[in-house]
Curated annotation (Swiss-Prot):
Pfam families tied to this protein: FtsJ
Gene: rlmE
PANTHER family reported in the protein's UniProt record: RIBOSOMAL RNA METHYLTRANSFERASE, RRNA METHYLTRANSFERASE 2, MITOCHONDRIAL
Name of the protein in question: Ribosomal RNA large subunit methyltransferase E
Protein family according to the UniProt entry: Belongs to the class I-like SAM-binding methyltransferase superfamily. RNA methyltransferase RlmE family.
Positions that bind S-adenosyl-L-methionine: 81, 83, 109, 125, 149
Molecular function terms from GO: rRNA (uridine-2'-O-)-methyltransferase activity
Primary location recorded for the protein, binned into one broad class: cytoplasm
Keyword rRNA processing: yes
Length: 244
């Protein structure tokens, strides 16, 4: 590994260059070099977040203000935990803001996640038959915010990956419709590809405001974007059984 000093406009930057080790693919070397030089990765290490993804939800909340002290948050696909960390801070789950109400944060992921102070974490396959009932039991009431950063393992085929993540978003949205308080917020990561249009239409029927955002922390070469649906209309907006 080597470093190179570059300067511009009076500032010096230190860029890390990674040599391709024996047995390591060039693509792996380039990924590692990008990680080591990514300002969000560097910032996350300094500020104690578990990954650069924390800044995506920070930037979304800075823009829309859905994480409030006293709020009840469910984070689906929470590994490695950056979104939960942000939620804990913003809803005052640790009670560090003495003059503000304390919120709660519940995280769920297929993978095991290291404990996060102020959050309740469970390992669970959210697509299993009884998953939503389990999560509702752990939640013990309604939620103000449901966030989903769920993603299926990459297949290498963009169309397939797009359809898989849309299916996860639809499952998360169905759960949100069931647990959100009226006026609540749903936030989810999607991959652009066309199939998200039906999801958008569904959300617009159930929320007063739906926005598609690519926050600065989302890499420019990524097809990911985030849907932020605010102002949940409530379960009364759903058709009654037998209604056409």
């Amino acid at each position: 590994m080597t470093t190179k000093n570059t300067s511009g406009r009076g500032q010096r930057e230190l860029r890390v260059r990674v040599k391709t080790a024996k047995g390591r693919k060039l693509s792996s070397t380039l990924w590692l070099e990008r990680q080591l030089n990514d300002p969000y990765v560097i910032r996350a290490k300094k500020e104690g977040y578990r990954g650069r993804a924390a800044y995506k939800i920070l930037e979304l909340d800075d823009k829309f203000g859905f994480l409030k002290p006293g709020g009840r948050v469910v984070d689906l696909g929470c590994a490695p935990g950056g979104w939960c960390q942000v939620a804990v801070e913003r809803v005052n789950a640790l009670g560090q803001k003495k003059n503000k109400p304390e919120g709660t944060v519940l995280g769920v992921d297929l993978q095991e996640v290291e404990p996060i102070s102020g959050a309740e974490i469970h390992q669970l396959d959210f697509l299993s038959d009884d998953a939503d009932e389990k999560v509702k039991g752990w939640l013990g009431g309604r939620a103000d915010v449901v966030m989903s950063d769920m993603a299926a393992a990459a297949s290498g085929h963009k169309g397939t990956d797009h359809l898989r993540i849309i299916a996860l978003c639809e499952a998360a949205a169905a759960f949100a419709f069931d647990v959100l308080e009226e006026g609540g917020t749903f936030v989810a990561k999607v991959l652009a590809g066309g199939a998200e249009n039906e999801l958008q239409a569904l959300l617009k029927k159930n929320f007063t405001k739906v926005a598609n955002v690519k926050p600065p922390a989302s890499r420019a070469d990524s097809s990911e974007k985030f849907v932020v649906a605010m102002g949940f209309r409530g379960r009364a907006s759903e058709p009654e059984e037998g209604e056409a």
